[in-house]
Every structure is written in structure tokens, then in C-alpha cells.
């Protein structure tokens, strides 16, 4: 009798698919859950980019947490500036409205005030700046150097200083770059102060006024960073031993920061040690040579474009777990449309489920209360 023979060669099932080295660095976007391979990759990344030690005195701050803190501080500062500008405009409008009746009264009395009032004495003119003011030059205006031509020009607006060239007011964190001055001028995080680690070895005045102001202050922290945690860990340990309790070190330094946030947070040209190595066989390796590195700008605040880039990379880093997919959003919207009273209930204040809104608008309510306090 003939035995039953399988159709095809069973060795084809054991044959492995050949891998292309050009696309070896590309990882799958599909989350298949925890695995031993992911665990070993995470351990290798920690050993490569982080320098964890036992019994660390200082606390660590993740790069993503630092980016979220920057977005909150920048949003709160912009809201405060808008409110201040509106208040200034309202006060100017009130002043102009209040000056119109005075001008009409002065024109009606020909600049002499009410007929029944006695003319003030010269001493009253000098002591009281507002006594007997008219469209003509008074004694006080002559003394102070104000003439009729100056009055006709109207109030001169004072030139406001460029607030964007200064650090954020009432900032909850103090960012210190512990590298040398040359490295700081080449590249640093926006809003960081240069504080070389050699400054800690000074016998007299090792700390600046800003550091003393933020030391153990309620609702404020001090953040140290460098390229790869070599200097920052030493400086953080020394400062914690000297009584700093609100000290944090940026985990990974500029090396991890440049990998997760290539744009928006850093000004200047990154050093070669912090730049991510190109994978073998990639097309970018044959690009034209770059020019000389650009120095860092004297930049203290983030522009709206920088904040958009930070938010984009932050969403990419958080992954699809925190952000629902388009399919889930479409299914949820389809379910809401089937319910007849769903949309009407959403329009009522405090009634029905909350609709999907912008995360930036959701965080604005928390910003008013300063969540870092």
C-alpha cells in the first residue's frame, strides 16, 4: 500500500525570510505587548543612554515630563501677557475718555476755571501739580519743562521692553547647564543658564543669586543637565550634599533630548557625541557635507513654532495608547449620532458626556492654578 504523501515540502515552513540590512533599523508600529525582546532592548537602551547608580541623592526628571512642564509654563505666560495687554488698553481708553470732559470744561471757561473760584496762589501751583491746569502753560508745567506744543501732541507711549528676550516671569524651574562655557555657547536648551561644574569648587560665592533664590523654595525646582550625565550627576550629588532638596537631573541629558525632541527645545548645533548615528545603508549617508556649526542664540523663550514642534514630538513619544485612533473616534461619533438626544444633551452646561476638545484648552484651566505650585 502506498503511504499518504504530503503535498509540498515541509521545509518551506522552516525557511526564514531574508532580511534587508537597509531597513533593519525600521521598527514596527504595531504594539504586540510585552516580550523578552522588548525587555532586553530597553535594558540595552538604559545602559547606553543613562547612568543609573545605587543610592542616588538627587531625583531624576524625564525628558517628556520636562517638555510638558515647558508647554504649561509657556502657555500660562502667554495668557498672562494677553490679559496684561488688554488691561493696559482698557486703562488707556478710560484715560482718553476722562480727558475729553476736562477739555470741554476748559474750552467753555476759556482756560480760567469756574468764575466763582478764587485764583490759586503760586505756592498752590508748585505744591499741587493738578491745580489750575489749562490748555496754556502753567507755572508747574513751565518748571517741569512742558509746553503747549507737548500738550498738543498727546500722551507719549512708553516703549515697552522686549519681554520675549527675558526669561519667563515666576518660572517654576531654574535650568542650569553644567558644561563649560564653550559648549554652552555652541548649543544649549532654550532658557538655560550657564553654570560650569568648576564653579562648585569656588571657596567664595559658588552660587549665583538665582540659585540661592530657587534653593529649597516652595513650588520651585532646580534642573541640571549636560551631554550624557557624566558631569550633571557629579554636580547634582555635590549640591544635594550641600543641602539642596529640590534638585533634579535631566535623565539622559542632551543626548536623549536630541533623540526624542530633535527640534524646538535646543538652540545651536548639537555636538557630535549627542547626534544620533545614521543606520548602515541609509540614503541619508550620501547627503552633501554640512557647513560649519552655528552658535547658539541668546534665546530665553519658546516661539509658537517651537511649542508646536514640542507638542508634536511629545504626542509621537507618548504613542497610540494615550491618543485614540481615528477608527475609535469614528465609531464613537457613529454611536453618538444614533442616539437622538445625545447632541442636545452635550450642549447643556454640565449635562451629558463631554465632547472631544483640544488638550491645550483642557489644560488651560489647570494653568490658571499653577499646577507646579
UniProtKB/Swiss-Prot annotation:
Ranges where the Rhodanese domain occurs: 169-266
List of residues that carry Phosphoserine: 96, 99, 121
Biased composition (Basic and acidic residues): 298-312
PROSITE patterns listed in its UniProt record: RHODANESE_3
InterPro entries xref list: CEP41, Rhodanese-like_dom, Rhodanese-like_dom_sf
PTM annotation (Omega-N-methylarginine): residues: 343
Listed Polar residues bias regions: 106-127, 355-366
This protein's UniProt keywords: Autism, Autism spectrum disorder, Cell projection, Ciliopathy, Cilium, Cilium biogenesis/degradation, Cytoplasm, Cytoskeleton, Joubert syndrome, Methylation, Phosphoprotein, Protein transport, Transport
Record-linked Gene3D superfamilies: Rhodanese-like domain (3.40.250.10)
Superkingdom as given in the UniProt entry: Eukaryota
Clinical disorder: Joubert syndrome 15: An autosomal recessive disorder presenting with cerebellar ataxia, oculomotor apraxia, hypotonia, neonatal breathing abnormalities and psychomotor delay. Neuroradiologically, it is characterized by cerebellar vermian hypoplasia/aplasia, thickened and reoriented superior cerebellar peduncles, and an abnormally large interpeduncular fossa, giving the appearance of a molar tooth on transaxial slices (molar tooth sign). Additional variable features include retinal dystrophy, renal disease, liver fibrosis and polydactyly.
Subunit and interaction comment: Found in a complex with TTLL6.
Family label: Belongs to the CEP41 family.
Role of this protein: Required during ciliogenesis for tubulin glutamylation in cilium. Probably acts by participating in the transport of TTLL6, a tubulin polyglutamylase, between the basal body and the cilium.
Designated name of the protein: Centrosomal protein of 41 kDa
Organism: Homo sapiens
Lineage: Eukaryota, Metazoa, Chordata, Craniata, Vertebrata
